[in-house]
């Protein structure tokens, strides 16, 4: 099992990071909370989780061990796969997710793409006890730090990032269109668009 990878960020295309580890490039899918901390050429440590299926092997990477633990905990919930777990961690900070579960806030959870009312209720029931020990987390304000994207189009980058979370193209376009006039950087557009969709 690959527990973590230490290397240099070679390329970024939300939500995937290409990490150069001693000349070998690893494609790693990350939540936006991790992705938005990375810059091309940066040396980083990503805490990883490997998912093996019949047709593919996929690495998921996280900026810290706690986020990886939360991801693995989410995967234990019936009906939650890696894509949904990644979407949850991209939309909600660890702190907000724990708070949401502790306070039975179904309305916040159903705003995550792919999470319906039944899934949200199942998450509440199955995670309540497990999350009691996870009171500390990343603050929601710091969930999407600054990033420098390679693309010349911040709007296109933001739309692609939102679609990677599971939002429909039209939903992503509308959310980005509503906030793009106020921002010039992709990360700022993503952050504002996510906030607008969580209202």
UniProtKB/Swiss-Prot annotation:
SMART domains according to UniProt: HhH1
Region called Flexible linker, residue ranges: 143-150
Regions annotated as coiled coil: none
One Pfam family this sequence matches: HHH_5
Ranges for region Domain I: 1-63
Protein's UniProt name: Holliday junction branch migration complex subunit RuvA
Places the protein is found: Cytoplasm
Chain spans, region Domain III: 150-199
Role: The RuvA-RuvB-RuvC complex processes Holliday junction (HJ) DNA during genetic recombination and DNA repair, while the RuvA-RuvB complex plays an important role in the rescue of blocked DNA replication forks via replication fork reversal (RFR). RuvA specifically binds to HJ cruciform DNA, conferring on it an open structure. The RuvB hexamer acts as an ATP-dependent pump, pulling dsDNA into and through the RuvAB complex. HJ branch migration allows RuvC to scan DNA until it finds its consensus sequence, where it cleaves and resolves the cruciform DNA.
Lineage: Bacteria, Pseudomonadati, Pseudomonadota, Gammaproteobacteria, Moraxellales
InterPro entries to which the protein is assigned, alphabetical: DNA_helicase_Holl-junc_RuvA_I, Hlx-hairpin-Hlx_DNA-bd_motif, NA-bd_OB-fold, RuvA, RuvA_2-like, RuvA_C, RuvA_C_sf
UniProt note: domains: Has three domains with a flexible linker between the domains II and III and assumes an 'L' shape. Domain III is highly mobile and contacts RuvB.
Assembly with partners or alone: Homotetramer. Forms an RuvA(8)-RuvB(12)-Holliday junction (HJ) complex. HJ DNA is sandwiched between 2 RuvA tetramers; dsDNA enters through RuvA and exits via RuvB. An RuvB hexamer assembles on each DNA strand where it exits the tetramer. Each RuvB hexamer is contacted by two RuvA subunits (via domain III) on 2 adjacent RuvB subunits; this complex drives branch migration. In the full resolvosome a probable DNA-RuvA(4)-RuvB(12)-RuvC(2) complex forms which resolves the HJ.
């Amino acid at each position: 099992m690959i527990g973590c990878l230490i290397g240099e960020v070679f390329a970024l295309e939300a939500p995937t990071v290409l990490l150069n580890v001693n000349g070998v490039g690893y494609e790693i899918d990350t939540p936006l909370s991790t992705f938005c901390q990375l810059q091309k050429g940066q040396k980083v440590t990503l805490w990883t989780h490997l998912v093996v299926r019949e047709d593919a092997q996929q690495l998921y990477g996280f900026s810290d061990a706690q986020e990886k633990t939360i991801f693995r905990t989410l995967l234990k919930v019936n009906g939650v796969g890696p894509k949904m777990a990644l979407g949850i961690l991209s939309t909600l900070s660890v702190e907000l997710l724990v708070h949401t579960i502790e306070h039975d806030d179904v309305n916040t959870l159903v705003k995550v793409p792919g999470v319906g009312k039944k899934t949200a209720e199942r998450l509440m029931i199955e995670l309540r006890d497990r999350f009691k020990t996870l009171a500390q987390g990343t603050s929601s304000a710091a969930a999407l730090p600054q990033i420098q994207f390679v693309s010349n189009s911040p709007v296109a980058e933001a739309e692609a990032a939102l679609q990677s979370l599971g939002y429909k193209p039209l939903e992503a376009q509308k959310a980005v269109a509503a906030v793009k006039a106020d921002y010039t950087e992709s990360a700022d557009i993503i952050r504002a668009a996510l906030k607008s969709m969580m209202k």
